[in-house]
């Protein structure tokens, strides 16, 4: 899980979702997991 100021899709499998007022990226590749902090 990477915590970044700006999250974006890295590949075509990445999905932007909102969870508990946070923008997150979930993907089939675990390296692409991100959270806005």
From Swiss-Prot:
Record's protein name:
Large ribosomal subunit protein bL36c
Q: Which NCBIfam families match?
A: rpmJ_bact
Keywords associated with the record: Chloroplast, Plastid, Ribonucleoprotein, Ribosomal protein
Family, similarity comment: Belongs to the bacterial ribosomal protein bL36 family.
Where does the chain cross the membrane?
A: none
The UniProt entry, under PANTHER family, shows: 50S RIBOSOMAL PROTEIN L36, CHLOROPLASTIC, LARGE RIBOSOMAL SUBUNIT PROTEIN BL36C
Instruction: Identify the species of origin.
Output: Marchantia polymorpha
Subcellular location as annotated: Plastid, Chloroplast
Q: Which Pfam families match?
A: Ribosomal_L36
Q: Mention any one GO cellular component term assigned to this protein in its UniProt record.
A: ribosome
Q: Please name the gene that encodes this protein.
A: rpl36
Q: Which domain of life is it from?
A: Eukaryota
Its chief place of residence is plastid
What Gene Ontology molecular function terms does this protein carry? Answer: structural constituent of ribosome
- Provide a GO biological process annotation: translation
